[in-house]
């Protein structure tokens, strides 16, 4: 009797073991089939967790015009300077006694609009993201972009430091090898602009809010396209020739990235 019970117990254990092995095999096959993406293949880093949480992809690329309209500090006052600007970059005055200034937001919007127009002309499903209030800035900008879940998120900015600073550079998230690859490609694409020198790409160490919150299914890159604190460089980055060159070369490179993903 005891021997019979032991035999039945062994059979039950064997069946349970087989069941566990089958379930494990099914889970592995599912993961391999639906979540097997490489950086080179798809320009994104996908995991089971992030894929299940990410919304449906609504566009291929989001181009964000950095900052929001009227943001304090993102401007250069030009009261005592002679500045040559195109008609679409206004001299603003808030009536606060500080005088006339050029807003970074206006420069960013000009470049972003030109880039989106060229991407769409090349058949890329690109969206333009412009912020008009503080509620759409920093981390909020990243959360807004996440709703569209693009392959690529490119945020266009211009830098401010001192009157002699010069150059453009790109930024990517730390430990994001694909982000670095895209950042380098975009920087190299505009290296021959003849007006603003290229600097090395830099890793975001956590202080750039919009990059911190972007979905892991999206590759985020931020471009600082020149220093508007330098009057000479301000004139260059606002010029139609610079904007057209940069937007054309970026559009070509982004199109190549998307179509060969």
PLM feature spans:
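Sec-dependent signal peptide cleavage junction
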Residues: 23-37
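A short, glycine/acidic-enriched catalytic loop
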Residues: 73-102, 160-193
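Active-site histidine-acidic residue metal-binding/catalytic motifs
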Residues: 39-142
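Bacterial N-terminal signal peptides that target proteins for export
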Residues: 4-13
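Bacterial N-terminal signal peptides
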Residues: 15-24
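Solvent-exposed loop/turn segments at secondary-structure junctions
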Residues: 67-70, 132-136, 158-163, 175-178, ...
């Amino acid at each position: 009797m005891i021997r019979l019970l032991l035999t039945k117990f062994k059979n039950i254990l064997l069946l349970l073991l087989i069941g566990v092995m089958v379930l494990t095999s099914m889970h592995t096959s599912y993961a391999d089939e639906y979540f097997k993406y490489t950086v080179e293949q798809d320009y994104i880093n996908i995991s089971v967790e992030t894929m299940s949480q990410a919304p449906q992809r609504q566009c291929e690329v989001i181009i964000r015009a950095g900052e929001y309209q009227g943001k304090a500090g993102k401007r250069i006052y030009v009261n005592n300077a002679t500045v040559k600007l195109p008609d679409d970059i206004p001299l603003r005055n808030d009536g606060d006694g500080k005088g006339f200034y050029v807003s970074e937001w206006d420069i960013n919007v000009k470049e972003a609009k030109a880039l989106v127009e060229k991407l769409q002309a090349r058949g890329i499903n690109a969206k333009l993201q412009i912020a008009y209030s503080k509620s759409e800035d920093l981390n909020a900008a990243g959360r807004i972009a996440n709703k569209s879940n693009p392959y690529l998120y490119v945020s266009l900015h211009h830098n401010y430091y001192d009157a002699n600073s010069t150059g453009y550079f790109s930024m990517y998230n730390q430990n994001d090898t694909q982000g670095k690859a895209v950042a380098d490609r975009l920087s190299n694409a505009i290296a021959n602009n003849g007006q603003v020198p290229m600097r090395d790409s830099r890793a975001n160490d956590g202080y750039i809010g919009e990059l911190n919150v972007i979905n892991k299914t999206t590759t985020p890159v931020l471009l600082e396209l020149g220093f508007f604190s330098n009057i000479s460089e301000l004139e260059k980055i606002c010029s139609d020739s610079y904007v057209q060159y940069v937007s054309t070369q970026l559009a070509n490179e982004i199109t190549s990235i998307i179509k060969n993903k």
